[in-house]
């Protein structure tokens, strides 16, 4: 499968494990001040997250969602990392 030119690398990590590592085209996450969306080319960012639903648009055009228990989201270059206490 070829990587989309709109995709970027995302890792979702808990203290126990690497929950997700792959290419996504969009992430919607619950920031402390409300939902925010990240797409390829976003400016560098470090944001605190509250508990809530995270939605991913994957590079194969499918979607996925899950609940997180707070954490932090970092965007730097063409990579993003979501650190959370727990994910389900």
UniProtKB/Swiss-Prot annotation:
Lineage: superkingdom: Bacteria
Record InterPro entries: ATP_synth_F1_dsu/esu, ATP_synth_F1_dsu/esu_N, ATPsynth_dsu/esu_N
Mode of membrane association: Peripheral membrane protein
Any one cellular-component term (Gene Ontology): proton-transporting ATP synthase complex
CDD domains associated with the record: F1-ATPase_delta
Subunit structure: F-type ATPases have 2 components, CF(1) - the catalytic core - and CF(0) - the membrane proton channel. CF(1) has five subunits: alpha(3), beta(3), gamma(1), delta(1), epsilon(1). CF(0) has three main subunits: a, b and c.
Full protein name: ATP synthase epsilon chain
The species this protein was found in: Chlorobium limicola
Gene: atpC
């Amino acid at each position: 499968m070829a990587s989309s030119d709109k995709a970027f690398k995302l890792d979702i990590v808990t203290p126990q494990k690497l929950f997700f590592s792959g290419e996504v085209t969009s992430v919607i996450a619950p920031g402390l001040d409300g939902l925010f969306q990240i797409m390829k080319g976003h400016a560098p960012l470090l944001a605190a997250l509250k508990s809530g639903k995270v939605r991913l648009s994957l590079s194969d055009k499918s979607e996925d969602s899950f609940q997180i228990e707070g954490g932090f989201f970092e965007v730097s270059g063409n990579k993003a990392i979501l650190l959370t206490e727990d994910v389900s």
